[in-house]
Amino acid sequence: MNDWMKNIPSDYLVSEINLPGTHDSCAQYIRFSHISRCQRNSMTEQLNMGIRLLDIRVKFDGEKLKICHSLLNCKKDKRKKEDLLFDDVLKSCKDFLMQNPTETILIIFKREAGKNEEATYDYFYNTFVKNSEFFYTRNKVPSLASVRGKIVLLNRCGANVENAEYSDENSGINLSGWPYQNSRKDALLQKVAIPERSKKSEQFFYLQDFFNLNPKKKWELAVLPTIQNSPQDKAMLFNFFSGSNFFSSPKRYKRIIFKRFFGYELMPMKKYGWFVLDFPNKKIIKKIILTNY
């Protein structure tokens, strides 16, 4: 599954492709793993399995951009001594794309802790993005043709609006309006505006990210209705399977929701959007990918 996108027509927008993704993609080696671990596979393993959407949470300490899950730092290996850095994530992505130039990787970039969003994005942009040939940074959903071999930046961080250096050309797809959905009384798919600097925006994306419903309710009220009623337009659609609360760990959510998902028949060539998963296996990734053909 390392090069499955080679068979997708190049004129498709990436939002028209059903993508398997991971939630808190780097939370493999982490303390308090019962409640905080979300992945069993490394970044490279995920990409080779077919994952194309990565959820990267960061903490800038003034010197380094560390990968974290909430306040906990993600670690490089099972010894849990050395912090995982964005440098490591980027190297894994670059190495994969150089070996598989037909593919694209979408990164949701979010400041989770540490310095404020302005300082975090300034460091991220100037250190990793500026003058890089690997990043697609326009505030517009691209065609697959324009981003094969590249990383599409989905920016939840919110670049400093006072900094004239930033524009709709170099700050990524603007997801800074991403709402906290658990404050809502319903679990219905939400339509969220994508702000633009240069003009009044008509862009939007769809979001289902209710993470503190119990697993059965999460499937019944959030995940399944999003699958059944997925809008067939060209907007991005995020459908999070992940969840965690006092009574249920990420692994329990995965076990209950995956079992129901495997029992639900998906239709080929229907748009379902982007599935954001904890602990995905090859079987569920293949099920998602095959809907594109």
Model-assigned labels for residue ranges:
Residues E117-Y125:
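Distinct, well-ordered alpha-helical segments
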